[in-house]
Structures are given as C-alpha cells and as structure tokens.
C-alpha cells in the first residue's frame, strides 16, 4: 500500500514537521523500531556483564577490546559513502519501474477518437481493445507482483473476473511459446485495429499507425517491468551494503560501551549510547529505504498499488471509449448522452479582453507569486542618458578604414525608453500588489451574501460583475476582465464607480 503524506508537507512549518514525524505506517519508526529495541537490549546485557560479572583482569581485557573496536570505526566502514551511492541507484531504478506501469488513458482516447462508429460491433471492438491491454498488464503483473498473484492465482480467475473470456483462455493455453504469452492480447489488439482500418472505421493508415504506436508504447512499459524483474541489482551489491550496516552496529555493541574502570574511564557514564542509537536510526532507516525500493511490486507499506492500477485502467478505459464518443449521423453511442455530448461552442469569458485577470479566492490572492520574468529585465541602464552610441566591436573596427567606420556609427535616442520605464515604475509603486488587495478587501469585507448556487442576494455574480464593468470598458481601451471587478450590494455600486 502506498502511504500518501503529500498534504502533510504542503507547508514548511512545525505542524507539517510533526504531522510527518508522528506517522507510523510506512515510517522509519515502524521499519527500525524492532531492530533498535533488540540492539539496545543486547547492548545493555553486554554492559551489565562487563560491569557486574567480569573480574578486574577480565574488565581490563574487555576495555582494550572497546578501544580497539571503536578506533577509526567510521573510517574503516564508510556507511555514508556506501549508502549514498546505493540508495541513489535504487531510487533511480524505482522511478523507471514506476514509469513502466502504464496508464491506459492515452490509448483509450485514441480508440474513442479515431475508431468511428456507434453500432454495437464498433462499441464491442473499442471495449475489447481496452480489455486486451488491461489483460496484458494483468498477465505481466501477476508474474512479477505478489499482490496481483494473490488476486489472480490461476488463469481461470482472470476469466472469472471478466478480463478475458473462456475462449480467449483456451487460445492462450494452446499457444506454443515456452517463454511467455504476454504478447498475445497485444497482438489481438493490433489485429483489431487493422481490421477497423480495412472496414473504414479508421479513416486513414496514418491514424491507424497513431493507434498502433500508442499500443506499442503501452507494451514497451510492460516489457521494461519484465526486464527489471528478470535482471535485478547484482546480488553482491545489496549484500555488501546490508552486511556492512549490520556489521557496523554489531561492532558498536562492544566499541561504544562506556569504560567505567581503569586509568582512562569514559568522561560520562550514560549506560545508553544516545548518539549511537541516533546513528542506528539514521543508517538503518536509510538502508530500509533501499530494501523497500528494491522491489516496489511487493506487499510492503510503500509498494506500488498494482491491483488499483489494473482496476483503474479497466474502468477508466471502458468509460472513455464507450461514453465520450459521438457519431456524425445517428446520434450518441451511450445511454449517458450528457457524458458523450460535446459542449456547445460559445465565446469564452475572456473574449475581447486585453488584460486578463484570472480569479483567486481572497485568501489565496494573498500568496505572493514569482512570475517568469528575467532577473535583469527591469533594470534601466540608460536612466540618466539621452542617447547611446552603437559601434562595432574594437576587434572589428581595426579591420575597417575610417570611412567604413563612420557608416557603422549609430546614435539611439533613449528618451522614450526612459519615460516609459519611469511611468511603469511609478505605476508599480502606486499600485503595489499588497495595497491593491487591501483595497479590495476593505471594499468587500462583510458585504457578500452568497447562495448555494453561486449567486449573491439572488443575482448571478458573473452577470452583475459584467453589468458593473460595462461603462468602464467602453471608455477604456485596455479593458480588464469583468470578473476581476469586485461585486458589491446595490447601495454601494454608486460609491464604487467613483473609485
């Protein structure tokens, strides 16, 4: 099950930090707590034996072991270096596996758009194309994911679930391919597309090739999943990492003991090695990241939702091909006509507007936005000049005679540029974003009474906003989107117009 915590980290504050930290499922606490408890118990057991059961001479020998094991331990086993490379490699591999699990939306949209026809035969073809792709995905995933294998333990369960018919299962059983049969349903899909083109349901070979390419892209993703399952990370690599981390903390069981006797005792005797326990939490948790991501198709908390992907692809794909299509002559192909009907084409709300101002709620409008504007675009380098002189570079001037040099000399008047720049800067200072928003808030605060259908005092807000703007728009060529004008109760409209 994939653990979602995105909403918890939507803001960088202490509340988000604690919301993230206090989770249990999929957390570092769940992954490490049991091993940390065992390690701490063994550490305390060794400490008790050292303190109370060993003779003074044995304690001297044990203290020599403590110094020996703790000497240059971090340098001899560089866990940060080892884990950094390994986890980066595993995360990149995990991302490729995630991208290989295909969504059927693109292919379904092409089926619905390019395979024309509202008759039952065409509808069956479009739906079967979706089903064949989902069947291919299920066949692949049930061989590489325990989630899907438990859901479909036999081929009969695939037929019982509706992903294939018993006739199709018989065909699969009689295919003489000792390696795989994943390609079979893909081949059925390609054959159906070709038959549709021959029957005129697909208008051209170009459109047929577009559909074929999309099916091929879906198949390529499934093939990449099989390759990642077939060729895992070389066994030596995870063995070295996992063994190094555990050996490190086995050595720490002795090397991090507090020396309580002898000429050089530890400066402080805490019994529990707090810093080493923090190291255990960090390094072991870091290693658990790699362990969880080595096979993201398993059954851990953070593994991918393979069964959900199959369900989503089947339901969404069938919905797309069977509801979002319209025939030119005979009407709509689905009972849910309102879903298949293309909306009437009307002018959008921003028609004829020079300055478009998309709307925000008052709360979200307070958030500053960093626009895509060059960092040097607002700098005026000719502020105190009337003109600038343009000339070739000195390296080129040396190649020209004096008469040719004069022909390249240009004088550029920058007075208009400076005037426009000064005007723009003045407008920005007079109409700062915070000041304008504050004015809008003071005008509208406590004045709205909005009904459930989006109207205010029984009047549609959109219509009233357009009515208020009419007089302003006719006198100002640089129109502002009418919806950006505040809507006020009738008693304030006259006052508002003066602003």
Swiss-Prot record:
Subunit structure: Forms oligomers.
InterPro entries: Bestrophin, Bestrophin-like
Region feature Disordered, mapped onto this chain: 417-455, 474-499
GO molecular function term, any single one: chloride channel activity
Function, as annotated: Forms chloride channels.
TM stretches of this protein: 29-49, 77-97, 235-255, 267-287
Protein name from the UniProt record: Bestrophin homolog 22
Protein source organism: Caenorhabditis elegans
Keyword terms of this UniProt record: Cell membrane, Chloride, Chloride channel, Ion channel, Ion transport, Membrane, Transmembrane, Transmembrane helix, Transport
Family under the similarity heading: Belongs to the anion channel-forming bestrophin (TC 1.A.46) family. Calcium-sensitive chloride channel subfamily.
GO cellular component, one term: chloride channel complex
Pfam families per the UniProt record, alphabetical: Bestrophin
Keyword Cell division included in the entry's annotation: no
Residue ranges with Basic and acidic residues bias: 417-432
Protein location: Cell membrane
Gene name of this polypeptide: best-22
Membrane topology: Multi-pass membrane protein
Keyword Cell membrane tagged: yes
């Amino acid at each position: 099950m994939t653990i979602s915590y995105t909403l918890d980290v939507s803001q960088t504050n202490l509340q988000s930090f604690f919301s993230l930290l206090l989770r249990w499922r999929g957390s570092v606490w769940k992954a490490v707590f049991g091993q940390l408890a065992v390690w701490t118990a063994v550490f305390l057991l060794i400490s008790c034996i050292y303190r109370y059961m060993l003779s003074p001479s044995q304690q001297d020998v044990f203290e020599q072991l403590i110094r020996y094991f703790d000497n240059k331990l971090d340098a001899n086993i560089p866990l940060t270096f080892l884990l950094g490379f390994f986890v980066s490699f595993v995360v990149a591999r995990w991302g490729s596996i995630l991208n290989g699990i295909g969504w059927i939306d693109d292919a379904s949209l092409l089926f619905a758009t390019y395979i024309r026809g509202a008759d039952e035969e065409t509808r069956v073809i479009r739906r079967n194309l979706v089903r064949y792709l989902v069947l291919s995905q299920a066949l692949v995933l049930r061989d590489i994911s325990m989630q899907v294998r438990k859901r479909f333990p036999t081929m009969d369960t695939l037929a019982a679930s509706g992903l294939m018919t018993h006739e199709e299962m018989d065909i699969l059983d009689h295919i003489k391919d000792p390696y795989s049969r994943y390609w079979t349903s893909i081949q059925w899909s390609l054959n159906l597309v070709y038959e549709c083109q021959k029957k005129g349901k697909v208008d051209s070979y170009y459109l047929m090739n577009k559909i074929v390419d999309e099916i091929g892209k879906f198949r390529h993703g499934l093939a990449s999943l099989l390759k990642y399952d077939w060729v895992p990370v070389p066994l030596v690599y995870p063995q070295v990492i996992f063994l190094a981390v555990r050996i490190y903390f086995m050595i720490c069981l002795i090397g991090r003991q507090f020396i309580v006797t002898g000429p050089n005792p530890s400066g402080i005797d805490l019994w529990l090695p707090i810093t080493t326990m923090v190291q255990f939490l960090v390094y072991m948790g870091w290693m658990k990241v790699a362990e969880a991501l080595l096979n993201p198709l398993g059954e851990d908390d953070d593994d991918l939702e393979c069964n959900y992907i199959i369900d989503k692809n089947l339901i969404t794909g069938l919905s797309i091909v069977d509801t979002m299509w319209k025939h030119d002559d005979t009407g709509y192909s689905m009972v849910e006509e309102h879903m298949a009907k293309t909306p009437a084409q009307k002018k959008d709300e921003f028609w004829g507007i020079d300055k478009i101002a998309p709307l925000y709620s008052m709360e979200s409008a307070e958030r500053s936005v960093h626009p895509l504007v060059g960092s040097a675009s607002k700098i005026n380098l000719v502020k105190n000049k009337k003109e600038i002189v343009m000339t070739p570079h000195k390296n080129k001037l040396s190649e020209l005679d004096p008469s040719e040099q004069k022909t390249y000399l240009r004088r550029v008047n920058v007075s208009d540029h400076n005037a426009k720049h000064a005007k723009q800067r003045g407008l920005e200072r007079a109409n700062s974003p915070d000041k304008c928003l504050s004015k809008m808030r003071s005008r509208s605060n406590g004045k709205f009474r909005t009904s459930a259908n989006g109207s205010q005092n029984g009047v549609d807000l959109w219509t009233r906003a357009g009515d208020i703007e009419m007089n302003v728009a006719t006198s100002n060529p640089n129109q502002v989107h009418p919806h950006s004008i505040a809507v006020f109760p009738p008693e304030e409209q006259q006052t508002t117009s003066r602003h």
